[in-house]
Amino acid sequence: MLQPEIIEFLASTTPQILAKNIPVTENRESKRHDIQQKAEAGEEKAVSPFEFRPQRLRFAVEDEYFEDGDINRHMYLQNIVTSFVDDKQPPTISEFRCHIAGCKQLFDTLEGYEHHYNALHRNVCSNCKRSFPSNRLLEIHILEWHDSLFQIMAEKQCMYECLVEGCGLKFKTSKERKDHLIRTHSYPADFRFDKSKKIGRTTEKKTQQKKDAHMEVSATVLQQESSESMDFSLTPEPVETEPMQAANLKPRYSYKVPSSICFGQGSVRGFRGRRKK
């Protein structure tokens, strides 16, 4: 704010106050600049333009200074509790069945169905209907099981990839890969990913089928012979003394073919009745 002498000197046309009598105000900027220079020079008597002195204050726990903060904190915690209580429960839905044909799994939540579908139905081989937990394992399975050129290429180079993602090692045989998985990646010893050999089961099935076919043929022959009133004599072979061999032996029959039945090229058609003379 200007001093009254300066206002009178500026406002009147004929000022009665001389300019030299006007008081000159102190330049604060110059004074502050001088103080800053003294402080930089390291003089201890440098006076700060501020009279504020920092002072540590201590308050009790129940002081009024913390009252507003305690109220806000209490309201904040109360809102959190009420928000947890007011959270709406997920809507309950009736049980539904998996839409994949042949799967009878029931679900009451959408999350359970998504987990089931991703684990069992997302990565499924279209040839053998096997399911895999990841797309990479499915691709390796298709390459090793259903690619006709895989075995030819495996004889020339390493084709069996490691099943762990990020491990790019390849092996000559599936046994080497299995040993690598057990030793390096701590897979269980009974882990199996390669194609299983079913030679024994296939042989047993073929043997059983042959036995069944032989029994059917024998039963058919016996029925035909009984219908034609054929005479036969039962001549069982002598039974050996050993019990194990006697259990495995079966009685053999020798048949007498009637004169009305012929076999061989150029003969009369079999099972034809005699011509009347």
UniProtKB/Swiss-Prot annotation:
Residues 225-244 are annotated as: Disordered. Keywords: DNA-binding, Metal-binding, Nucleus, Repeat, Transcription, Transcription regulation, Zinc, Zinc-finger. A zinc finger (C2H2-type) spans 96-121, 123-146, 160-185. PROSITE patterns: ZINC_FINGER_C2H2_1. Transmembrane segments: none annotated. It is found in: Nucleus. GO terms for cellular component: nucleus. Its main location: nucleus. One of its GO terms (molecular function) is DNA binding. InterPro entries: ZNF511 (IPR039258), Znf_C2H2_type (IPR013087). Belongs to the krueppel C2H2-type zinc-finger protein family. May be involved in transcriptional regulation. This is Zinc finger protein 511. It comes from Danio rerio (Zebrafish). The lineage of its organism: Eukaryota, Metazoa, Chordata, Craniata, Vertebrata. The gene is znf511.
